[in-house]
Amino acid sequence: MRKRREGTANNSPTPEVTRVRTPRKENHEVLATVGSLLGSKRVNLQCMDGVVRMGRIPGSKNKKMWIREGDIVIATPWEIQDSKADVIWKYTRPQIEWLERKGYLK
């Protein structure tokens, strides 16, 4: 018979979020919601500044970030074309709750 580890129950509370990455204005970063997946590392983004952009997931983040519809991400709009952006960060559920409490998300 195996011993059961303490604290491994599924009903344990979610960890408290202490640090959350916020968009940096000096880098022109904006919060965005993933609208739809377009395929080929591309997504439709509804940005918080009111612009709908086509987002690109860079190759360095492709395998590390699994993005689904409805996820909250940080996007950096392109300097050349404002209708396109790079996805640079994806938030987890506790981080999204923190953003909502602090007023970053409407």
UniProtKB/Swiss-Prot annotation:
InterPro entries: NA-bd_OB-fold (IPR012340), RNA-binding_domain_S1_IF1 (IPR006196), TIF_eIF-1A (IPR001253), TIF_eIF-1A_CS (IPR018104). SUPFAM superfamilies: Nucleic acid-binding proteins. GO terms for molecular function: RNA binding; translation initiation factor activity. Keywords: Initiation factor, Protein biosynthesis. It comes from the Archaea. It holds the Pfam family eIF-1a. Residues 1-24 are annotated as: Disordered. Gene3D superfamilies: Nucleic acid-binding proteins (2.40.50.140). Residues 18-92 form the S1-like domain. The keyword Protein biosynthesis applies. PANTHER family: EIF-1A. Belongs to the eIF-1A family. Seems to be required for maximal rate of protein biosynthesis. Enhances ribosome dissociation into subunits and stabilizes the binding of the initiator Met-tRNA(I) to 40 S ribosomal subunits. This is Translation initiation factor 1A 2. The gene is eIF1A2.
